[in-house]
Amino acid sequence: MGLTVLALIGGYIVVLGVAAWALDAFTGLSGTGVAFMLSLLALAMVLVQWLFSPYIINMVYRTREPLPGEEWIVAEVEQLARRSGLKPPKVVVSEMNMPNAFAYGSPIAGSYVAVTRGLLRLLPKDEVRAVLAHEVGHLKHRDVTVILALSLIPIAAFLIGRTLVWAGILGGGGGERRGNPMALVAVGAALLAAGMVFQLIVSHFNRLREYYADAHSALVTGSPRSLQRALARIHAAYEHNPHLVEEARSNEMASMLFIVAPLTSLTASPLVDVDYLVERLKEQETNPLVELFSTHPPVSKRLRFLDRLASRIGGIEHY
């Protein structure tokens, strides 16, 4: 599982223990162990979901092995994995029309890189390669596992906070030491607020990992421009095909793993030259409030980031 994840889970359990002790000491609620046990149960459920999630994702997204004529995808991923110092992940194709790709995995199921049928239809091979390199970057950085571990903190805060608020509203704890109901509500509300803050931190971390994956793609392919073009085409496809947005909305399980957030609205013509589209999107204004709650950076920022990166690696050639 890795030392990082074990440390995060250990920290999660310590936080739960300290929270239970503090509540018992300062509110007199002898039943705070219930919240602690509920949170441990939530931890167990999340871990089980993580271990078996690849099988669920494969079913929900109707994945299959590449067909004859699609073997080049496997070859590309194997080459990208070797360049990244990784064991090649399993490559599958999702029978979805929305153009996207995602990486996922667990110790039980192994690592996967999935591309949708819509992506293969939309992008030329060099841009598909750039997208695949982005997903391999997520596997290289263990992003799925680390994001999941970080997400346990707001889950714990929300669960304990909600339990305490309702315990206070219903009259406090039981036993010989009856706690102060208002203190329970106050502590619970503080935990709920802390959970919201932690969730924003997790979203920020997820956006940061997207930049790292973009950088990985640019470095291993030597072509930041290919990824820029791919991002622009995917965004334009969502904007001008509402049914793709609806398909993405109905299959949100892996939306945090997508290369592009599928529910973003942009103004772009699918008939315009892709390089012109890239330049237009770089100039898009961003909404800081929307970005705060998003799991992906705005496309304009990603394109400008790749510009800055290209100026540093301009001498790298395509493989």
From Swiss-Prot:
It is an enzyme of class 3 (hydrolase). Binds 1 zinc ion per subunit. HAMAP family: Pept_M48_protease_HtpX. Its EC number is 3.4.24.-. It is a multi-pass membrane protein. It comes from the Archaea. It is found in: Cell membrane. This is Protease HtpX homolog. Zn(2+) binds at H134, H138, E210.
